[in-house]
């Protein structure tokens, strides 16, 4: 088997997103050097409580990490060291919150700039708590000089919204003022900044502020009093902020917006000509919140018909409308402090390499290492920009999300119920021991299954709980045009690169890596519909449930979940199965069996040989223009 494409992907992902420039040696870090940097950061963080026992745990996890038996937080690889100590939110892959307070938008922008994905609820009972907006005075003008920091960029949005908020928001001195933003302090595009990154320049920020201001003006135009912010407008504010973050090229700006099942504007947010009229909406997944016991069979049938016909809306089953989920829906959270103040809560993720779990012993070793890494990460809660409620929420449950990628590479080991339970219990036990040494809380929930797009690329496994796509396929990866790795690939292999249709600012390209799967792999075609859902249900029952410390959860119904994408072969059968088993599911992405072509530049696109095309469609198929265009 030729693994050149997969190896190129792995190296590209590591050097593009995680390896740091070493000034001393005049080159980029190796894998082992990057891991050492992260683990030494943990040693520095916990120096005051270091004991021989704690060091033995750290050393154990470090070796497993270097062996790629596990991965720690990918944000730690990216930012580990002084950058992460400056902004400890950078430890976490994703965050969630209710959109229900004046500071939400600037805190959201801050987290996106830190590299965190954001899940946010615009359900009516949350949006109703936002301050109302009103017209500003035409002749009252104030200047805000934007500091060249992520706090400064976030503050710019705080100032803009405060100028409209009836209560003055978080910057009451700007209440009712026309705001002139001065970008002179922001370094020009391409200038070197800390961590080996390059400055994005002010254009993306300026554009997002202008677009958000236009939305606010549209709300107050023709009014004499204060008006409420609609759900769709609050959603678009975050989408424009996401575009500004993406222009910086630090990472993908991942978001998910959760809304009410009767919110017609949100239900239609990605219908019609949205791709032309509102391209910023491509930055999010949108999901309707469905309370399991309140969902009728008829309502479910209508939702599934829309999903089948239009691919929208996404949906999330929940026990409580106060619960929130990260963009990939594998972490369930309740981002409210004990005194009722809303804030953010975080996904604290580690990854087990299922491709290396060839027996119970190797699986248990990975479970132990994943738990150690996750517990070390859980202590990073010095959030200087965010509210104290966020710190309280994060420290209270001290969540872990020990995930497995490559389930289908060793299914006999990983899907054995006894092994799943044993592994989950090991994660809980190790977490309890290490948390005690660190002086932090034991985790309320410890196990999850994330989609593992980037992690599977680095480790060379199938993604998450999914099978290999096909024997041969193109793996389409979104990359920023300003990245050095992107420039090298474009120069040496230009036929692999094309402009991204998902980048409204033209800052991204798509690189198509040719991949040949390992012989004997379980492919997507072997895991259609209900068969794949059976695997998801089993992982939820044995891996997730047994990794939950129910007595430590702030709500006994809170659970982590299995992130999954199901290729549907029989829509009626899948509809019935999901409804009858909704207790075991949260979010499910449904893709038609023609899904490769349903979305432009889909992440995976199967490649057929000429003989396979003839076998499937007949001799004359080679002269069919549609197939020829598709093959090209």
Locate the predicted segments by residue.
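Extended catalytic cores of very large enzyme megasubunits
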Residues: 1-632
């Amino acid at each position: 088997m030729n693994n050149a494409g997969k190896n190129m992907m792995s190296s590209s992902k590591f050097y593009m997103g995680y390896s740091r420039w070493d000034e001393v040696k005049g080159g980029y870090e190796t894998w082992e050097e990057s891991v050492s940097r992260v683990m030494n950061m943990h040693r520095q963080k916990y120096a005051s409580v270091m004991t021989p026992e704690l060091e033995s745990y750290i050393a154990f996890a470090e070796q497993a990490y270097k062996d790629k038996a596990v991965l720690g937080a990918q944000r730690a690889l990216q930012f580990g060291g002084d950058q992460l100590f400056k902004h400890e939110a950078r430890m976490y892959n994703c965050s969630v919150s209710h959109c229900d307070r004046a500071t939400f938008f600037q805190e959201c922008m801050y987290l996106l700039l830190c590299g965190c994905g954001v899940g946010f609820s615009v359900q009516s009972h949350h949006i109703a708590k936002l301050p109302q907006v009103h017209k500003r005075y035409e002749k009252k003008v104030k200047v805000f000089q934007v500091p060249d920091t992520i706090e400064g960029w976030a503050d710019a949005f705080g100032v803009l919204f405060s100028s409209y908020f009836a209560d003055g928001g978080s910057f009451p001195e700007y209440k009712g003022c026309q705001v002139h933003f001065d970008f002179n302090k922001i370094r020009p595009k391409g200038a070197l900044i800390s961590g080996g990154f390059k400055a994005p320049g002010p254009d993306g920020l300026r554009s997002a502020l202008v677009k958000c201001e236009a939305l606010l003006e549209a709300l107050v135009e023709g009014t004499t009093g204060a008006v409420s912010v609609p759900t769709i407008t609050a959603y678009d504010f975050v989408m424009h902020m996401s575009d500004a973050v993406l222009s910086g090229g630090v990472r993908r700006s991942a978001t998910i917006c959760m809304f009410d099942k009767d919110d017609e504007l949100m239900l239609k947010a990605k219908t019609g000509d949205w791709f032309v009229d509102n391209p910023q909406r491509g930055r999010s997944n949108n999901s309707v919140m469905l309370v399991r016991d309140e969902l009728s069979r008829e309502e479910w049938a209508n939702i599934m018909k829309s999903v089948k016909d239009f691919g929208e809306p996404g949906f999330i089953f929940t026990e409580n409308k106060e619960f929130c989920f990260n963009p990939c829906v594998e972490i369930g959270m309740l981002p409210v402090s004990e005194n009722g103040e809303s804030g953010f809560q975080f996904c604290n993720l580690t990854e087990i390499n299922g491709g290396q779990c060839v027996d119970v012993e190797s699986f248990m070793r990975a479970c132990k290492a994943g738990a150690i890494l996750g517990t070390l990460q859980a202590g990073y809660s010095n959030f200087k920009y965010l509210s104290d409620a966020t710190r309280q929420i994060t420290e209270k449950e001290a969540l872990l999300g020990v995930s497995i990628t490559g389930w289908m590479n060793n299914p006999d080991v990983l899907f054995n119920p006894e092994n799943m339970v044993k592994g989950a219990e090991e994660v809980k036990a190790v977490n309890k021991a290490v948390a005690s040494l660190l002086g932090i809380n034991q985790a309320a929930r410890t196990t999850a299954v994330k989609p593992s797009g980037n992690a599977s690329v680095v480790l060379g496994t199938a993604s998450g709980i999914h099978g290999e796509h096909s024997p041969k396929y193109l793996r389409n990866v979104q990359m920023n045009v300003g990245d050095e790795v992107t420039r090298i690939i474009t120069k040496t292999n230009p036929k692999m690169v094309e402009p991204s249709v998902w980048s409204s600012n033209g800052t991204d390209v798509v690189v198509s890596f040719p991949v040949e799967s390992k012989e004997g792999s379980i492919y997507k075609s072997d895991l259609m519909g209900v068969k794949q859902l059976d695997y998801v249900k089993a992982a939820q029952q044995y891996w997730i449930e047994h990794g939950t410390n129910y007595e430590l959860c702030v709500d006994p119904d809170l659970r982590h979940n299995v992130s999954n994408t199901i290729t549907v072969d029989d829509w009626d059968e899948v509809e019935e199965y999901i409804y009858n088993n909704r207790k075991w599911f949260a979010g499910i992405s449904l893709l038609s069996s023609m899904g490769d072509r349903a979305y432009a530049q889909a992440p995976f696109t199967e490649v057929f040989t000429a003989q396979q095309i003839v076998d499937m469609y007949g001799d004359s198929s080679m002269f069919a223009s549609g197939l020829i265009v598709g093959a090209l």
